[in-house]
Structure formats: C-alpha cells, structure tokens
C-alpha cells in the first residue's frame, strides 16, 4: 500500500501544454515578425537569426492539481445480533488494515505536503449500528489518541446491538453536513466518503434507501459491502437499497466469500482516493 500512496502523491502534479511566444525556435508568429521587422532585416544582413525571437513554441510545464482541502471518510460497522464470530473476525481484520493504512497515507500526505503544494486534511470516523448506533472514533481524534481510538474501534465489534438499523446512523451523518459543507462538496473543495459493512439487508429498507439517496444527491460517495450467507429476499432488499435506480451500483454482495472483505474495502478506498487525486 505504501507504494500506492507514494504514486498517488506524485500524481498530484500534472504536466500541461503551454504555448509561449517570442521564442528563438518554433512556429513563426506573424505578429511578432511584423513587430520585430527591423531586427529581422538586420539578422538577414548578418545571416544570424539566433537572437530573432519571432516564434511560438509549446512547452510541458508541471502544474499542481487543485486538490480538496478536506477528505472525510466514515466507516459504519454492523454490530447486530446476526454478526457471528467469523463475520466479526473478518470485520476486525478489515477495519484494522483499512484504518491503519489510511493513517499511513495521511502521515505520508502531511510529510510530503510540498509536493502537492496544498495542505489536505484527511480524517476518519467509525460508527457501530444495530438496534441502536454510536460513534467510537471521531473525526477530531488525532495522533496518539487517534491510534487508541482505532484500536477501540476494532475491539468493540461484538454483535450486541440487536436488529440492523443503519438508517439512523446514516441520517445522523447526513444531518451533520452543514449548508456550507454541502457547497464545499459540490464544488469539490471537500470530499465525504462512507463505507458500510453489514451481514444483511436493513431492517428498515425504505428508510435506508431514502437517506442513501439524499447522501448521493449531496455528492457524498457511499458504498456498502455485504458479508455472510444471504437469502434471496435479503439479496433483493440489499440491491433495492444500494443498487437499484442509481447511476452506478453502491453495494457489493460477498455472501460466503467473507475472506475477500479486506481486499474489497481497501480496493474501494484506493479507487475513491485515486479518483480525487487523478481527476482534480
């Protein structure tokens, strides 16, 4: 991952084609020739055109991309009663790898801020949801405290929250987006990304679909990954919430391929961060 992050930082600069006039070589600029006609006559007499700057020439120049000032990444973890030991262990492993990898990227980003010529704030938060929901890591957590909260996020996955009400936590995240932040997100000065890990469809699919739609309309990137055996009805419900009637799918069903969870989540994180750095 460190090589990927390094290349990503390097892509913050792009080469642009810039045309400059009054050059010694290149394509003849008629206006410059007319303006410098006395010099042209003198050069013709001497047979020396080296100092005659009447040409246009294209140059490749390095230019900093306009990157966002802030990137917020939220992780929502299913902590409902149906999360068995295999799912919990896979989620712990995935959360560990992803949060620590993002932390590495953030440290690398701050250390190489001069390469981007811009300061970018990259922050994460973690939510657990079930019958109820609560936050175990805030955006504001930094340095050693952040590391402690990352560990706390991992150890608190313990399937003690009953039903699967992800709508409530998503709604709270949506309510926390101010009008100013919505404008910043629309103008790509900020990015907000949400990743959810769940073992089934929401207990309240209509409510979840509505809030997912609102978040997408606000230009928030949101994705869900389903793990564990899933019924046909729950598959249909999951697709209704996350994939149906959207421009592109936002939900991935892994079912029994739980071992792919870490790969899929990190792939989504990488893809989203790559799109920010490459498309800016």
Tell what function each PLM region has.
Residues 1-280:
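Acidic, glycine-rich A-domain
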């Amino acid at each position: 991952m460190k090589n990927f992050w390094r290349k990503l930082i390097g892509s913050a600069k792009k080469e642009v084609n810039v045309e400059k006039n009054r050059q010694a070589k290149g394509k003849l600029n008629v206006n410059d020739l007319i303006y410098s006609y006395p010099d042209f006559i003198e050069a013709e007499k001497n047979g020396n055109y080296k100092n005659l700057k009447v040409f246009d020439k294209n140059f490749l120049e390095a230019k900093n991309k306009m990157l966002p000032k802030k990137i917020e990444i939220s992780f929502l973890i299913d902590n409902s009663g149906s999360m068995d030991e295999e799912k919990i262990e896979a989620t712990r492993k995935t959360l560990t790898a992803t949060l620590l990898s993002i932390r590495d990227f953030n440290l690398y980003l701050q250390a190489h801020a001069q390469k981007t010529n811009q300061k970018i704030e990259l922050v994460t938060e973690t939510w657990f949801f079930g019958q109820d929901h609560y936050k175990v890591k805030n955006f504001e957590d930094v340095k050693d405290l952040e590391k402690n909260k990352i560990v706390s996020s991992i150890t608190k996955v313990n399937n003690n929250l009953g039903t699967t009400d992800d709508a409530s936590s998503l709604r709270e995240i949506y309510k926390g987006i101010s009008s100013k932040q919505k404008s910043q997100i629309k103008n790509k000065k900020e990015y907000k990304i949400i990743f959810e890990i769940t073992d089934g469809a929401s207990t309240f699919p209509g409510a979840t679909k509505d809030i997912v739609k609102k978040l997408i309309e606000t230009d928030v990137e949101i994705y869900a990954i389903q793990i564990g055996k899933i019924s046909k009805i729950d598959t249909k419900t999951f697709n209704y919430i996350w994939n149906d009637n959207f421009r592109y799918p936002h939900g991935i069903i892994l079912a029994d391929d739980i071992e792919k969870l870490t790969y899929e989540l990190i792939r989504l994180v990488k893809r989203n961060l790559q799109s920010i750095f490459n498309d800016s």
